[in-house]
From Swiss-Prot:
Monomer. Its cofactor is FMN. This is Dihydroorotate dehydrogenase (quinone). The lineage of its organism: Bacteria, Pseudomonadati, Pseudomonadota, Gammaproteobacteria, Candidatus Palibaumannia. It comes from Baumannia cicadellinicola subsp. Homalodisca coagulata. It is found in: Cell membrane. It comes from the Bacteria.
Length: 336
């Protein structure tokens, strides 16, 4: 494929400009003869998770297509599922720029985007226009200006609007780039949020006559005891799945590299071992009670197999997709 040449050009640009240009071009080619440039045939490796049939276990993680603008073009690349978002009730511009940095030598990224998105209504409108027939996950969050005490209301608003269009809903309570968001991951505030989400899910199931599973996306920056406490709560509330993990604020493996001192969440290869260990701990604790979607640093067949050996049923990529392009999807799935 042409991706090595495309990457060479894109990596001359500011990372966020390169991202915007990529989204624009993918949007432009969808449904045209030019879609053949990204379309590839991958083997079927069927798996069932959360009651959903996936054609293969490799998905695109949230964050790349926040507004659902290029679902069709991404779907042509062979992903087993696509997760769009994170989306919030109202549009927001996110944090100040620059807010996205490449750690090229480490095959990593640091972002402090801050849930920049055009709002849930815009996302729904884009989904309605798409022709993607695969599994679609929708990742939801809270607006920055919503007080943390009222944060659950934002999740419930988003749930109601995306429910008819989602195959599963991912609840993002682990981004390090929205003030206080990670406080939703423990104690009474988590208990309250999960109860409200499950109540809403039951009402929406009755109204729409379909059950849409809920998965919670967690941080890697928790102690083992915090992880176990969270797992207990997720099981107690009958949450359908857990996405492990989001980005890390740790810089242990990238110390001294260009941009490593930038604040935000670190993703890509430096996150690989950390996220795999979280999956291993969760898998040991959960004993199959809750499926795990593994994400963080998967950039090869070997690292994909490591995630699954640790206990993940499904896996996702994002940063490695930026570095290696669509060919990585085929390389992983073909021998997984």
């Amino acid at each position: 494929m042409l991706y090595p040449l495309i990457r060479q050009f894109l990596f001359q640009l500011d990372p966020e400009k390169a991202h915007e240009l990529t989204i624009q071009q993918l949007k432009r080619i969808a449904g045209t003869p030019l879609e053949y440039l990204v379309r590839q045939s991958v083997p079927t490796k069927a798996v069932t998770c959360m009651g959903i049939a996936f054609k293969n276990p490799l998905g695109l993680a949230a964050g790349l297509d926040k507004n659902g603008e290029c679902i069709d073009a991404l779907g042509a690349m062979g992903f087993g599922f696509i997760e769009v978002g994170t989306v919030t009730p109202h549009a927001q511009i996110g944090n100040e720029k620059p807010r996205l940095f490449r750690l090229t030598k480490a095959y990593g990224l640091i972002n402090r985007m801050g849930f920049n998105n055009k709002g849930v209504d815009n996302l729904v409108n884009n989904i309605q226009k798409s022709h993607f027939g695969g599994v679609l996950g929708i990742n939801i969050g809270k607006n920055k200006d919503t007080p943390i005490e009222q944060g659950k209301d934002d999740y419930l608003i988003c749930m109601e609007k995306v429910y008819p269009y989602a195959n599963y809903i991912a609840v993002n309570i682990s981004s390090p780039n929205t003030p206080q968001l990670t406080t939703l991951q423990s104690g009474e505030i988590l208990d309250d949020l999960l109860r409200a989400i499950k109540d809403k899910q039951a009402k929406l199931q009755e109204y729409h006559h379909k059950y849409v599973p809920i998965a919670v996306k967690i941080t890697p920056d928790m102690t083992e005891s915090e992880l176990i406490q969270m797992a207990d709560l997720l099981v107690q509330h009958k949450i359908d799945g857990i996405i492990a993990t989001n980005t890390t604020t740790s810089r242990e493996l990238v110390h001294g590299l260009d941009h490593s001192s930038q604040s935000g969440g670190l993703s890509g290869r430096p996150l690989q071992l950390m996220s795999t260990e979280v999956i291993r701990i969760l898998s040991s604790k959960l004993q199959g009670k809750l499926p795990i979607i593994g994400v963080g640093g998967i950039d090869s067949l070997i690292s994909a197999r490591e995630k699954m050996a640790a206990g993940a049923t499904l896996i996702q990529i994002y940063s490695s997709f930026i570095f290696h392009g669509p060919r990585l999807i085929k390389d992983i799935i073909s021998d997984l």
